[in-house]
């Protein structure tokens, strides 16, 4: 039953709390209240929890997404001679895919206007990672953003006040009210920003596992279905790929150290196999859906060409300098990023195979080090985190190095070492590894 409500915050909250289907007027009232302040922070938190507990129908999700999209500016890309394409990840630990992926697709002829988020819960934020680079401005004007996309082919920025401002407020409150993992809220949050960005094509990386918002495959499939249904229904060609997040992606988790792994990937110095497989799959989907590649084989050849020729690395370097960073970031990344005060090793507590990692716990350990937020206004320490993390399935001896820790002081380092060790489970037999792509 559809219920029409006056725009009184507590009445709209009550309707959803009681499991009613909100009509367009009620949804528009909530979204307007996000922007004009008619809903207080506590009321927004209560509404988020009501949606978390009661869910939303597909019609509600479509109306919610469109209302949040219309809460600000909607970008137009007239005069561009190639497809406008983006990728979005539901988030995980060590997920630096956006950086190499955007550079690869831009090098292949796509235009990638990527509007990224901050850290959310235990997951790292793309915008936070870019701010590891001295001078990098993640909040240029919209006109400057469009100019860089046209000139370079790619620009990665943080959410602006102009695009889906309703979501910007909701996103920050979800982070501190335990309402991150709601499929309707995730769907509307992602797609309001992506639809406002004026995309032709969107590729979704839906993470599944103990380091993802979606812990099990059924939930991941439900989210993928929700996003593709709402997005394709709104006129944006969208494909979702479900990828594993039962361990840290790549070999690092943090901010500056993930940017360094990105540089090593783009320059060919280090391409961790799972990370490379996911980058290839997502890049192929972006190229095929935009008709920049005619087949999977054609896409893979184009990806290899721009990586091996250095063109993708050049695109990333140009984007960094265009957005205020140094002109030679790829060549000398640590000249413009802060290193941690304490760098030490995490050693295995026993002999055996690394059978499981509590990936969420590792993400929360990075947050505890200062590399993420426990409150929306908190400052991030870009220097902290873990790198040289060994993957699942590796056999180690007691005392062998399984990761390296970057911390601001000895006390936080000791806590993080204990947390990392507690997150590792060993086995005597070689474990069965989860698939990289489902």
Swiss-Prot record:
The enzymes which catalyze the reversible phosphorolysis of pyrimidine nucleosides are involved in the degradation of these compounds and in their utilization as carbon and energy sources, or in the rescue of pyrimidine bases for nucleotide synthesis. It catalyses: thymidine + phosphate = 2-deoxy-alpha-D-ribose 1-phosphate + thymine. GO terms for biological process: pyrimidine nucleobase metabolic process; thymidine metabolic process. GO terms for molecular function: 1,4-alpha-oligoglucan phosphorylase activity; thymidine phosphorylase activity. Pfam families: Glycos_trans_3N, Glycos_transf_3, PYNP_C. Pathway: Pyrimidine metabolism; dTMP biosynthesis via salvage pathway; dTMP from thymine: step 1/2. Homodimer. Its EC number is 2.4.2.4. GO terms for cellular component: cytosol. SMART domains: PYNP_C. Belongs to the thymidine/pyrimidine-nucleoside phosphorylase family. HAMAP family: Thymid_phosp. PANTHER family: THYMIDINE PHOSPHORYLASE. Keywords: Glycosyltransferase, Transferase. It comes from Colwellia psychrerythraea (strain 34H / ATCC BAA-681). The keyword Cell inner membrane does not apply. It is an enzyme of class 2 (transferase). This is Thymidine phosphorylase. NCBIfam families: PRK05820.1, T_phosphoryl, Y_phosphoryl.
């Amino acid at each position: 039953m559809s219920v029409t409500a006056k725009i009184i915050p507590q009445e709209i909250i009550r309707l959803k709390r009681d499991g009613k289907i909100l009509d367009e007027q009620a949804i528009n009232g909530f979204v307007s209240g996000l922007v004009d302040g008619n809903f207080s922070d506590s009321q927004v938190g209560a509404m988020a929890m009501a949606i978390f507990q009661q869910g939303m129908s597909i019609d509600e999700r479509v109306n919610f997404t469109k209302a949040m999209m219309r809460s600000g500016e909607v970008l137009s890309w007239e005069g561009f001679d190639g497809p406008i394409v983006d990728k979005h990840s539901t988030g995980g630990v060590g997920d630096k895919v956006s950086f190499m992926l955007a550079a690869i697709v831009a090098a292949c002829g796509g235009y990638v206007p990527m509007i990224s988020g901050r850290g959310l819960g235990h997951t790292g934020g793309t915008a936070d990672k870019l701010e590891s680079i001295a001078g990098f401005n993640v909040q240029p004007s919209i006109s400057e953003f469009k100019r860089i996309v046209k000139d370079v082919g790619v620009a990665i920025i943080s959410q602006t006040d102009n695009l889906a401002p309703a979501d910007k407020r909701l996103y920050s409150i979800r982070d501190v009210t335990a309402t991150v993992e709601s499929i309707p809220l995730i769907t509307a949050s992602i797609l309001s920003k992506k639809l406002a960005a004026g995309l032709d094509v969107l590729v979704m990386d839906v993470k599944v596992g103990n380091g993802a918002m979606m812990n099990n495959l059924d939930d991941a499939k439900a989210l993928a279905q929700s996003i593709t249904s709402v997005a394709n229904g709104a006129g944006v060609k969208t494909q979702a790929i479900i990828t594993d997040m039962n361990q840290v992606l790549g070999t690092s988790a943090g901010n500056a150290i993930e940017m360094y792994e990105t540089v090593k990937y783009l320059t060919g110095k280090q391409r961790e196999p799972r990370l490379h497989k996911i980058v290839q799959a997502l890049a192929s989907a972006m190229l095929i859906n935009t008709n920049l590649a005619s087949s999977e084989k054609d896409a893979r050849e184009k990806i290899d060409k721009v990586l091996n020729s250095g063109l993708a690395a050049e695109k990333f370097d140009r984007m960094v300098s265009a957005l205020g960073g140094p002109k030679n970031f790829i060549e000398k990344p640590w000249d413009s990023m802060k290193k941690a005060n304490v760098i030490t090793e995490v050693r295995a507590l026993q002999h055996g195979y690394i059978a499981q990692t509590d990936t969420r716990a590792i993400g929360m350990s990075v947050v505890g080090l200062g590399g993420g937020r426990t409150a929306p206004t908190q400052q991030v320490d870009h220097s902290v985190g873990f790198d040289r993390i060994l993957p699942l399935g590796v056999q180690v001896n007691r005392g062998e190095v399984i990761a390296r820790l970057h911390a601001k002081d000895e006390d936080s380092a000791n806590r993080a070492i204990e947390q990392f060790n507690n997150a590792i489970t060993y086995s005597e037999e070689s474990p069965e590894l989860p698939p990289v792509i489902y």
